[in-house]
């Protein structure tokens, strides 16, 4: 009974050997999960035969439990794939194999827009099509919106064949613009576990999740080294937070007309204890993927609130310091209550710490609308960051109470181009018509600053005036 309570021993076959002839003992042991019961006197050949029989039954049961099919797609499940892939590679050790991981991008959004039935149709379509075009492949549904394929490597043109498969799947999809990302691990190392082989294909796939130009990525040693570095950064996160290795830097925002500082944006930098700096481009996307960004967002928010409290206590001039809020933080439970409490504990006006939401994070939905309304009701001012990079800008401006929009650098870069000038002129006019201020970010040239001044842009942020500075320098 105690053995069955132990998760390590729960699946181990148990044969009870006893000198008791009482049948109730035998019945009780079998009820508790014993695989067999051997009374005295022991016959060596009988005991050995029964042990072998129990082992074979256990192995057969394990194989049967692994051979399970996904109800929706009819494909193998993840556990079944692990089992059969291992058997196949052991059966043909001289064959070269590739593992392909396929991920349906924005699958939750597809379900929300088209409905769950269409989402299910897409999954069934992918299952059927992959089986059709990869006839020698072992295919499984790996997770809700991911598929895994083990296929033998052709001697030539594997990458070309892979491109043809991807094109066929895309062109025959049940909805237009279906986006599937593929991670491929070629010539798999058979000395490592099936799960690790799949992990390498997943690494490749994740490396292009934000790259809209590329749908196929291949695992290589460089990607493996990058994964090791990312794991080390994740492992270092707790100590870095505890030891305050994360520093808040500031990039000033300048009043276009007076050319004086009118505010700043808080940015994060990571200075390790040995003095080396970790690039934000390395750790921020990583922490956004694994969810650690929510704690980093709160860390920055607390630091800025403390700085604003110190400035106000010392009688220094007031100006707002905006804080970026990630998509993950926006959906984090208790966000409004927590951030409101931090502001009140520092006894500062909410106007001191406006919140910047990227255009993609603020993409309109009922949930986002409710959350934004709660932030505004608490007293926060909201800025739309990266305006012009997404497709929901006008909808968001119409229904969400933003006070400021920040023109993305990609728009500013087109200043001097006739159509680019027209777009910026009309966006500024639109924002002012909605009683919103406009901040242009990424301004690097005198000509850009002069144009924005003529267009009555409110504030400028960029290297033309100042790069991000540490707090002491700022």
Q: What annotation goes with each model-predicted range?
A:
Residues 179, 258-265, 290-370, 442:
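Catalytic core of bacterial c-di-GMP phosphodiesterases, primarily the EAL and HD-GYP domains
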Residues 68, 74-98, 105-132, 140-149, ...:
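Conserved long alpha-helical elements within nucleotide-processing catalytic cores of c-di-GMP signaling
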Residues 98, 144-146, 150, 174-208, ...:
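A short glycine-enriched loop-to-beta-strand structural element that forms part of the catalytic core
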Residues 60, 79, 91, 194, ...:
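C-di-GMP signaling machinery
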Residues 5, 10, 21-36:
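Alpha4 helix (beta4-alpha4-beta5 surface) of REC/receiver domains from two-component response regulators
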Residues 273, 326-333, 352-365, 378-474:
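EAL-family c-di-GMP phosphodiesterase catalytic domain
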Residues 125-189, 196:
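GGDEF/GGEEF active-site signature
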